[in-house]
């Protein structure tokens, strides 16, 4: 959603001003899908995922990386003051949304947000990881990264209406499940 300051982020909000290469490619992909849907009648549902996490998460992403570094007694990089907020969405909820989107046939083209529709401050995420790992985090403060946004927050009204999407896993439970997997996979 780029420089959009209105929250939660709705699918109808403008995305024409991305502030990272990743966001630019996502917007371009949606335009390409819209074009193919219009020209060739391809039924297309573009899903906008909000900070997906859970078992088997890529090791370079924040939750997995933080869990590993905390477990190793190493500092975790925190960009800015820790007040950035993310709409963390558990992988099982994303899977439920994807499955519903596969079966959706209400129109030829849709863009739909999939998130938990709740924001969590980075400091709170770190506290949850410390609690579940039963270890303190060492913080390595760093400047904000270019292209990072202060918050992500999904409006999932459309997903609820069109897909029956209803995320079930709140961050507290999701982190507990992630840490259980992390411990078993690291053993």
Q: Which residues make up each language-model segment?
A:
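Glycine/proline-rich active-site loop of Rossmann-fold NAD(P)-dependent oxidoreductases
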Residues: 27, 42-45, 52-65, 72-74, ...
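Conserved C-terminal active-site "lid" loop/helix of NAD(P)H-dependent oxidoreductases
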Residues: 91, 124, 142-166, 170, ...
